[in-house]
From Swiss-Prot:
It comes from the Bacteria. The keyword Ligase does not apply. Signal peptide: none annotated. The gene is acpP. This is Acyl carrier protein. One of its GO terms (molecular function) is acyl binding. Belongs to the acyl carrier protein (ACP) family. Residues 4-78 form the Carrier domain. PANTHER family: ACYL CARRIER PROTEIN, CARRIER DOMAIN-CONTAINING PROTEIN. It comes from Chlorobium phaeovibrioides (strain DSM 265 / 1930).
Length: 78
């Protein structure tokens, strides 16, 4: 899967889980500040990323994923 395909899937998950429009999402968007996620939203988003991309994201890594691009970069590395 290419980085562009991963980005598209991550954006789709964010739209689905957080109820934002795709055009509101930018790579530098912060889940909490820019997209309105609370801590539960963030946990659910991480779980959905794990399911969609078949990766395990340990809590210590999940805490470091605060922006859309950080999520994409993490998945690309796995």
């Amino acid at each position: 899967m290419t980085e562009a395909e991963i980005k598209d899937k991550v954006y789709d998950i964010i739209v689905s889980k957080m109820g934002v429009n795709k055009d509101q999402i930018k790579p530098e968007s912060k889940f909490s500040d820019d997209l309105g996620a609370d801590s539960l939203d963030t946990v659910e988003l991480i779980m959905e990323l794990e399911n969609e991309f078949d990766v395990q994201i340990p809590d210590e890594d999940a805490e470091k994923i605060g922006t859309v691009q950080q999520a994409i970069d993490y998945i690309v590395k796995k």
